[in-house]
Amino acid sequence: MLTNGPRGTKDVLPSEAYKWHYVEGVFKEVAKRFGFEEIRTPVFEHTELFERGVGDTTDVVEKEMYTFLDRGGRSITLKPEGTAPAARSFIEHKLYADTQPTKMFYITPVFRYERPQAGRFREHHQFGVEAFGASSASVDAEVINLAMSVYEAFGVKKLELRINSVGCPKCRAEYNKVLRAFLSSRLDQLCGTCQNRFERNPIRIIDCKSDSCQAQLTDVPLMMDHLCGECQDHFEELKKYLEASGLHYVIDPRIVRGLDYYTKTAFEIITEEAGKKGTVCGGGRYDKLVEDCGGPSTPGVGFGMGIERAILALEDQGIEIPKPEGLDVFIVTMGEKASYEGFKLLTALRRAGFSGDKDHLDRSVKAQFKYANKVNASYTIIIGENELEKGIAKLKNMANSEEIEIELKDITKLKEILSGR
């Protein structure tokens, strides 16, 4: 048991880490291009932050959080998402006092106790952006463009942008009355979870994945038809900005998202994975979140996308993730004195900015060359007794097997060759 990771977790091995470096690098490059700066928040937060921010009627808070009491008796939760912690940091450090908007991005592990499946784990990793302090639909469109740009930078095809408006507290309260009236005669046909949602948060019933519930919702009244004037105007503005940026979108009135803080804009990006359509990004506006978390009234909009899901999408579409270059040099030594001299040379090369390694297991020359191939070294440097007597080493180009001799006392020529000059 001790040799197996907990269910729902996954080790990222050295042979796979380059995929993560690539994906994270693209995330960061695109986010910075849009003027977003990185923020890092703790892995755990006070439980109340998520109860107040995410919503105590959500599946995340009711069923999926990793919550425990610390030694001081305080309720602590491993963060299940990144937006509420970003809002907490925005409040704590009084970032609202700066010139707005505040635009931030993060890459973070998040934790949810749910059934593990392809691309989804109990510990997974999320890239997210948050823009606080601007209520204009242009910021919504910018955030959506950022998300689409990430997947376009990956080369992912068949992207579908779906948008909706989930209204504001004012028009949602009126809509909830209409929705409850519609559902009241069908309540017995809904799953237990949706029956519990009926009074507390009926709009989440629309998002239920149960076939029996969906069968009762074929003609359900939609939030889109009950928006107040302000929310309707905001949605119309969003569409204009998306069209101005050349983004094609589909209006999907059934997108409600799984977190209670969303207001007005909600969106998802869909792509095809293993022959099935799957959501690879989701987000929206949350104009009440900062206030609900104890800060001043501040609008916000953002999204989250899973790194594991992104890698899976690339692999499913046959997109090759660039592999990193190998070592500049591997030093092959024969004998104790040669090992010392090789270590001295390797240290000098590393300090000069070159990547390299040497044998540490007293292996045969053949085994050392085999290892040099494994680490994809561009060159090998061979040092044995004969070479030491002459004060030289042999430099071998691993691509064409050409060998030349170099002076050990003066490695200027060696550095020029390794630099490609």
Swiss-Prot record:
One Pfam family per UniProt: tRNA-synt_His
A GO BP annotation: histidyl-tRNA aminoacylation
GO molecular function: ATP binding; catalytic activity, acting on a protein; histidine-tRNA ligase activity; transferase activity
Cell compartments where the protein resides: Cytoplasm
A cellular component annotation (GO) from this entry: cytoplasm
Entry keyword set: Aminoacyl-tRNA synthetase, ATP-binding, Cytoplasm, Ligase, Nucleotide-binding, Protein biosynthesis
CDD domains: HisRS-like_core, HisRS_anticodon
Protein name (Swiss-Prot/TrEMBL): Histidine--tRNA ligase
Organism domain of life: Bacteria
EC number: 6.1.1.21
Xref: InterPro entries: aa-tRNA-synth_II, aa-tRNA-synth_II/BPL/LPL, Anticodon-bd, Anticodon-bd_dom_sf, His-tRNA-ligase, HisRS-like_core, HisRS/HisZ, HisRS_anticodon
Keyword ATP-binding annotated: yes
Gene3D superfamilies: Anticodon-binding domain, Bira Bifunctional Protein, Domain 2
Similarity comment text for this entry: Belongs to the class-II aminoacyl-tRNA synthetase family.
Subunit and partners: Homodimer.
Organism annotation: Alkaliphilus oremlandii (strain OhILAs) (Clostridium oremlandii (strain OhILAs))
